[in-house]
A protein has these predicted regions:
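Signature of the catalytic double-stranded beta-helix
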Residues: 1-20, 25-28
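Hydrophobic/aromatic-lined pockets within catalytic cores
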Residues: 2, 47, 108
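A structural signal for short, well-ordered beta-strand segments
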Residues: 12, 42, 100-104
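Catalytic core of non-heme Fe(II) oxygenases with the double-stranded beta-helix
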Residues: 22-83, 97
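Catalytic core of Fe(II)/2-oxoglutarate
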Residues: 61-150
Length: 150
């Protein structure tokens, strides 16, 4: 069966990980923050990601081994952030890493009873249309186009 609806994080996170003796975040699973159980995390480096300037993700749930997501800019990585631990390390490289990350949930698996991560707030909805995908706006919302953005 083809996917006809998807919920996606309405505002992707832009992250900057400069050289530092401190990690940019703590080791965590998104389940600890109440995220959707079926979400898929997407991580997109906008600069080369390597060594300690990259995101580290648990290889298999519960194995405790985190592997670095290394690669050139523009390579998208996906993982099950709800169940896999992920974190950064102190960046001891000379390079600043810039990245985008966002989450998506296949439509049939979206839990609309979750108060913290709901449609019209954290998530937006897209539906398959004849010519691709169309964003479905909640009542009262408008989509800015081109020069309308100010």
């Amino acid at each position: 069966m083809a996917l006809t609806e998807i919920f996606f994080q309405a505002s992707p996170a832009l992250r900057v990980h400069a050289p530092s003796a401190h990690a940019a975040g703590n080791r965590h699973r998104d389940s600890g923050y109440g995220h959707q159980a079926s979400q898929v995390n997407f991580w997109l480096p906008l600069a080369p990601a390597f060594g300690t300037n990259t995101l580290h993700v648990e290889n298999l749930r519960g194995d405790g081994r985190a592997l670095p997501l290394e690669g050139d800019f523009g390579v998208v990585h996906r993982f099950w952030g709800h169940e896999l631990y992920h974190h950064t390390l102190p960046n001891d490289t000379p390079a600043t890493r810039v990245s985008l990350d966002f989450r998506a949930v296949p439509g049939p698996h979206f839990d609309d009873t979750q108060a913290a991560f709901f449609e019209g707030g954290y998530y937006a909805r897209a539906r398959r249309a004849a010519d691709g995908w169309a964003v479905v706006l909640p009542e009262g919302h408008t989509l800015l186009r081109g020069n309308q953005a100010g």
